[in-house]
């Protein structure tokens, strides 16, 4: 940093009156701060590094007080940097302004293979920090582990599961996998099947691996109850919102089975809980069915979570979360972005693969292509539906994707869902909530009423038998 750039930073501080994720402010009017290691660690452990500026007092309204001694403070800063592991090499700059001296310390980002950078006096587990907004927070045990797992190339997807026997696997599915695997590979086909199990990591030293459990066991949740998907439909746009009948969830399901089963179950859950409209395409003049979300994008997002979630012992108790809000869908999986790739590079560069064996097995079973095309497909399908591009979040050991619906106006003329015609005929006879829900084939009565019936009530198409008590358990719905 040049002296001119440091002066510009000082001016920026006076405008912002705050610290940021890459800017830390210290007074140092009476001496060098004794505890810099938390900021040295957190800045080193993030991709953008950070800058510490000495000589501005936050407690005095960001007053420019200057440092006590520009020469001595540089020595003290460097002394604390030498106590980090690996050693932090700051770039120090000194500038004079209005008779006061100010010092900046630029902290470079450490290579991912050197992270976490930690304070030697506290050790790796307690001396590693991460930056959250303007705060330095101690890393969790899992956050420390995630760096170690990448550096040492841990293969959590093929760790041995002693509780599972070979007989617990679906033998028919295994036979299909071996058949697909051997196809077009004469050398592999000549190898005995038992050896292929070891070669392809179904077994390790004749013991079953996690990948085999997740892909070939009929019910992996018998061994790992939380390696599942928890799917919910929320009545509002935030968790905790209460629906018209006092319900917290319009639909709620625990989706279990092997990875293929969970994928199918999650897609079915989303399909039954999103609306499908019939529209008139203004360009072709033809009727088209248009769901809230492109189902291809939904499938890729769910599959991405199942394949790339963290399967280490640290996350065994953390399920994937699928949450459908009024305006969006969120899919959250344990395990942040793996390896060197950054959030803005997703779908543009080839990433490191956290679970290569799981991905390879699913490729052989023709469930995934394993060609890194998932995120580009999601983006393309959202664009074709004229919806907002997906939002990706990497937050302290978890990864989320958000798909938004109805953000942009369609260049089409929408008409009522053709299913409404049948519903109106059904309601020629007054019906209870349960009768309507059963007729629509929906498990959640509250969801059926809120999403399919109440919009028609609001338009005056369907009427309530007790309009003055809309929540009455004796309420009937009918149309003239």
Positions of the model-derived regions?
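Conserved N-terminal catalytic/coupling substructures associated with nucleotide/phosphate chemistry
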Residues: 1-297, 302-407, 431-432, 461-464, ...
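Short amphipathic alpha-helical interaction segments
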Residues: 293, 443-458, 471
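Short alpha-helical segments that sit at the start of domains
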Residues: 407-426, 468
């Amino acid at each position: 940093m040049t002296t001119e750039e440091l002066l510009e930073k000082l001016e920026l501080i006076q405008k912002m009156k705050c610290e940021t994720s890459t800017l830390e402010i210290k007074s140092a009017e009476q001496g060098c701060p004794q505890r810099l290691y938390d900021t040295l660690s957190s800045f080193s452990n993030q991709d953008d590094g950070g800058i510490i500026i000495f000589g501005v007092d936050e407690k005095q309204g960001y007053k420019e007080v200057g440092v006590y001694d520009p020469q001595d403070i540089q020595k003290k800063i460097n002394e604390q940097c030498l106590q980090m592991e690996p050693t932090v090499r700051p770039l120090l700059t000194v500038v004079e302004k209005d008779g006061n001296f100010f010092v900046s310390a630029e902290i470079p980002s450490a290579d991912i293979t050197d992270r976490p950078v930690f304070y030697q006096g506290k050790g790796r587990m307690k001396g590693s920090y991460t930056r959250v907004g303007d705060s330095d927070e101690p890393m969790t045990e899992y956050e420390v582990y995630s760096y170690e797992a990448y550096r040492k190339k841990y293969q959590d997807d093929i760790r041995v599961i002693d509780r599972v026997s070979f007989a617990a696997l679906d033998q028919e599915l295994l036979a299909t996998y071996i058949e697909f695997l051997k196809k077009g590979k004469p050398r592999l086909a000549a190898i005995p099947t038992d050896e292929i199990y070891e070669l392809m990591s179904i077994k390790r030293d004749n013991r079953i691996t996690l990948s085999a459990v997740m892909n070939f066991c009929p019910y992996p949740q018998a061994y790992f109850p939380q390696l599942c998907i928890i799917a919910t439909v929320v009545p509002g746009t935030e968790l905790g919102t209460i629906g018209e009948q006092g319900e917290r969830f319009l639909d709620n399901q625990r989706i279990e089975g092997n990875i293929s089963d969970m994928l199918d179950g999650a897609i079915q859950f989303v399909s039954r809980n999103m609306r499908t409209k019939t529209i008139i395409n203004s360009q072709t003049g033809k009727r088209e069915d248009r769901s809230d979300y492109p189902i291809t994008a939904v499938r890729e997002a769910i599959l991405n979570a199942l394949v790339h979630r963290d399967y280490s012992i640290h996350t065994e108790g953390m399920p994937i979360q699928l949450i459908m809000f009024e305006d969006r869908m969120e899919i959250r999986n344990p395990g942040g972005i793996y390896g060197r790739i950054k959030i803005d590079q997703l779908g543009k560069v080839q990433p490191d693969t956290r679970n290569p064996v799981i991905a390879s097995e699913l490729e052989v079973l023709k469930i995934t292509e394993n060609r890194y095309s998932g995120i580009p497909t999601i983006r393309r399908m959202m664009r074709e539906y004229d919806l907002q591009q997906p939002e990706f979040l990497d937050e302290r050991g978890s990864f989320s994707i958000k798909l938004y619906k109805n953000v942009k106006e369609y260049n089409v003329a929408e008409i009522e869902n053709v299913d409404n015609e049948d519903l109106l005929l059904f309601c020629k006879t007054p019906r209870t909530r349960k009768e309507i829900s059963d007729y629509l084939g929906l498990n959640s009565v509250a969801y059926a009423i809120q999403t399919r019936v109440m919009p028609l009530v609001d338009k005056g198409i369907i009427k309530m038998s007790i309009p003055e008590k809309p929540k009455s358990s004796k309420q009937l719905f009918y149309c003239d």
